[in-house]
Each structure stands twice: as C-alpha cells, then as structure tokens.
Amino acid sequence: MTTIHATAIVDSQAQLDSSVTVGPYSLIGPNVKVGAGTTIGPHCVIEGHTTIGRDNRIFQFSSLGAIPQDKKYAGEPCELVIGDRNTIREFCTFNIGSPGDLGVTRVGDDNWLMAYVHLAHDCVVGNKTIFANNSQLAGHVHVGDWAILGGFTVVHQFVKIGAHSMTALCTVLLADLPPFVMCQGQPAQARSMNYEGLRRRGFSPERIAVVKAMHKALYRESLTLQLARERIADLVKNSPESLPDVEMMLLFLEQTSPQRGIVR
C-alpha cells in the first residue's frame, strides 16, 4: 500500500504505485504518475503532467512539473518525464516543456542531480549524468549520457552538451560542448578531454588514443571545423574499435548550430 504521510496532500486522480512513499507536507497534483519504489521526501511539490519512473529518490523541497518560466506559455498541456533510479536532491526545480519545442522536458535514468539544480522547459538530460550543486540549465538544453556539470555551471538556452563531457566549477557555457571535452571559464574554453572519466568507464587505451587525436584535430592544429571533421573521420581507418566514438563526435559537430558554434 502507498505510504502517504498524514500531512501530505495527494490528489485523488494522481496515479501512484502501491510502493511509493510520500513525505510530510508534500503536494501531488492530479496529472502526476509515479512508478514503483520511488520515494518523495517532505515539502515537495509535484504538479502538471508529470511522469516519474521507478526507484527514484526525490529529496525535500523539490519542485517538479511547474509551468515553464516562459511568458509565451498559455497553459498548453506540456509534460515533464523522468526515468528510473534518479537521485534528485534538495530544492531542485524541473519545469514542464513548452509548445515552442516538443512540449516535453525529459530526464533519463540513473542521474545524480544535486541540490538547487534547475532544468528549464524543454531540456533533455540523458543517462548517468552528474549535476553538481546549483547547475542551471536554460530552456531547450540537451545533455548527453555520462556528462558531468561542475557546481554553479550555467548553460545558455539551446546549447548542446555532448556525452562524457565535463564542466568545471562556475563555468558559463554559451556554445555547444562536444563529446569528451572538459571546459572551464566564463565563457567556457576547452581545456582537455575527460580521459580519467573514460578510463573509469572501461574505455580501452586504443579508444582513448583516438579521443586524444580528436582533441588534437579540434583544438591543437588551428583547423577550420570542416577540416577538423575530415581529420576525425579518417581516424576510424586505424581503429575500427573507435567507430562509435568517432561517429558520435561527427554527428554532434554536424548538428551544432552555426549561430551557437562549439566551445573553443
């Protein structure tokens, strides 16, 4: 049976699995769905068309599913969708999507989101990411799998953050951050590649060598972006094992907005 504290207010139309726990003084709206094993701490507000998967842990004072901070929003039925096994720490704020995009803010699985993280409307977060305290995403930001955002990182709207990338403390990200790249600064500048993270995730020395070569092509040879892409594409010839990594980088660079560009 669902465990709901006597002081919590859960709308009768909300759909909570029988194993969900809701802490004191939390408010759950009518269009909320919560999967098995999820724990909702005290003083949380979950509203809007919000779907939360299995085995998530939501800490006190989090606000999930509020309307977007967008003056154009006029009450359209947009959504927040959160996957499984996420940790959402104190005072996090995740807004629903907006009709100006796909109408969905989405969080994947196995993410670690520390206190005061903000996900604005239409953000898309992959799997196994880490957001340190007070990381702030403006609208329409996309974050790839395994990315790590340092504390107080702020991200401009529409920016894309590639898989396995990393930002340092207090980074201001105004341009797209390619996969594997570590950056720092206000505004951000590329510093290196996330080699230690790749080793911890089981990347072979051969794959890491190709990542180093991609870094050299992008940042050490003064090449145009087009020439760097051609150089990166050639790396597969000597390392078929690295094909997924090279393809991911090339696709990211191809999809980068000319107006936004990449971190240099």
Swiss-Prot record:
Domain of life: Bacteria
EC number: 2.3.1.129
GO cellular component, as recorded: cytoplasm; membrane
Keywords annotated in UniProt: Acyltransferase, Cytoplasm, Lipid A biosynthesis, Lipid biosynthesis, Lipid metabolism, Repeat, Transferase
One MF term in the entry's GO annotations: acyl-[acyl-carrier-protein]-UDP-N-acetylglucosamine O-acyltransferase activity
Associated pathway: Glycolipid biosynthesis; lipid IV(A) biosynthesis; lipid IV(A) from (3R)-3-hydroxytetradecanoyl-[acyl-carrier-protein] and UDP-N-acetyl-alpha-D-glucosamine: step 1/6
UniProt keyword annotation of Lipid metabolism present: yes
Subcellular location: Cytoplasm
Reactions it catalyzes: a (3R)-hydroxyacyl-[ACP] + UDP-N-acetyl-alpha-D-glucosamine = a UDP-3-O-[(3R)-3-hydroxyacyl]-N-acetyl-alpha-D-glucosamine + holo-[ACP]
One Pfam family of this chain: Hexapep
Primary localization class, coarse: cytoplasm
Gene3D superfamilies on file: Hexapeptide repeat proteins, Udp N-acetylglucosamine O-acyltransferase, C-terminal domain
GO biological process, one term: lipid A biosynthetic process
InterPro entries (UniProt xref): Acetyltransf_C (IPR029098), Acetyltransf_C_sf (IPR037157), Hexapep (IPR001451), Lipid_A_LpxA (IPR010137), Trimer_LpxA-like_sf (IPR011004)
HAMAP family found in the cross-reference section: LpxA (MF_00387)
PANTHER family membership: ACYL-[ACYL-CARRIER-PROTEIN]--UDP-N-ACETYLGLUCOSAMINE O-ACYLTRANSFERASE (PTHR43480), ACYL-[ACYL-CARRIER-PROTEIN]--UDP-N-ACETYLGLUCOSAMINE O-ACYLTRANSFERASE, MITOCHONDRIAL-RELATED (PTHR43480:SF1)
Known partners and oligomeric status: Homotrimer.
Function comment: Involved in the biosynthesis of lipid A, a phosphorylated glycolipid that anchors the lipopolysaccharide to the outer membrane of the cell.
Family assignment from sequence similarity: Belongs to the transferase hexapeptide repeat family. LpxA subfamily.
Designated name of the protein: Acyl-[acyl-carrier-protein]--UDP-N-acetylglucosamine O-acyltransferase
Originating species: Albidiferax ferrireducens (strain ATCC BAA-621 / DSM 15236 / T118)
Gene this protein is translated from: lpxA
